[in-house]
Amino acid sequence: MNYEFEREIGFINSQPSLAECLTSFPPVADTFQSSSIKTSTLSHSTLIPPPFEQTIPSLNPSNHPRHGAGGRPKPSPAGSRGSPVPAGALQPPEYPWMKEKKAAKKTALPPAAAAAAAAAAATGPACLSHKESLEIADGSGGGSRRLRTAYTNTQLLELEKEFHFNKYLCRPRRVEIAALLDLTERQVKVWFQNRRMKHKRQTQCKENQNSEGKCKSLEDSEKVEEEEEEKTLFEQALSVSGALLEREGYTFQQNALSQQQAPSGHNGDSQSFPVSPLTSNEKNLKHFQHQSPTVPNCLSTMGQNCGAGLNNDSPEALEVPSLQDFNVFSTDSCLQLSDTVSPSLPGSLDSPVDISADSFDFFTDTLTTIDLQHLNY
């Protein structure tokens, strides 16, 4: 142990002077700073930092009695007795300002509240107003989160009135409102900021609802239009199908009626043929009896008219009514008429007019040629 102590003493003596180190030793902070400065300026060895080696005796209190046992002068124990560093290295004494710091660390105050508390402690409570002291108390006692400001109904009413007229406040007006409502300027400013954000959200929600309502109305109108178009198309299809059905039914009825009328008409014609030639023959005979000299003229006119009708190339000349007009002079009727108008006809009917057989032969020949020409066309 003496060897180690002598080595340490020799190391210390290698420094400029032991007295300078010992005189600067009693306060720990001063010894550390002065020795570090001196060693940094005067020492030339850079291998081992001398300040660390110099502070070893002061940091180890067990070495001080050993220094006394060695018979060396002991100014360091007196310095160690006067300074609280040996106990403070591990457990420093608690001063009031240290207690405040520990309390601040335990409660984890926000920096704004800590600064306000420090300012309150420095300047005193007389410099702060009642409202600010309440805010500081709320912030310091409430933990990490600041409590919300409780506004009264009158304050809210006045703030809402002011916001209705002015969304943004100038500083003089803000100070005036804060003084009237017993609030701080910061509280008024924050309230107006929050109210502007609320107003913005409300307007955006209204715009979104209006746009959604417009979109829904447009979609509903489009759906209604589509439904109306579908209805109109369906009605048109029904009307067209009904018209087609009516037309088909009408044509079917017409065809049925024509089919019914065709055989009935044919039967009527066939039944009336035996009678109609008689009536026509009787009429012809009467005409022949009363107007016998005009028969060649009538025949000539009939022949001319028929020739004109045959020579005409217009479609009206070939229509069905013209053929129906000549159906009266059919081959059967002509044959019947030729049979009736026989050489024995004057004797059977006892007519006083004498008609030659040549004239009747000419009449029958002309009628047959006319009918044959119509049949050919």
UniProtKB/Swiss-Prot annotation:
Keyword Chloroplast attributed: no
Gene3D superfamilies the record matches: Homeodomain-like
A Pfam family this chain is assigned to: Homeodomain
Record-annotated DNA-binding residue ranges: 144-203
One Gene Ontology term, aspect cellular component: nucleoplasm
Places the protein is found: Nucleus
Motif window: Antp-type hexapeptide: 94-99
SUPFAM superfamilies linked: Homeodomain-like
InterPro entries, per the entry: HD (IPR001356), HD_metazoa (IPR020479), Homeobox_Antennapedia_CS (IPR001827), Homeobox_CS (IPR017970), Homeodomain-like_sf (IPR009057)
Record's function text: Sequence-specific transcription factor which is part of a developmental regulatory system that provides cells with specific positional identities on the anterior-posterior axis.
Name listed for the protein in its UniProt record: Homeobox protein Hox-A2
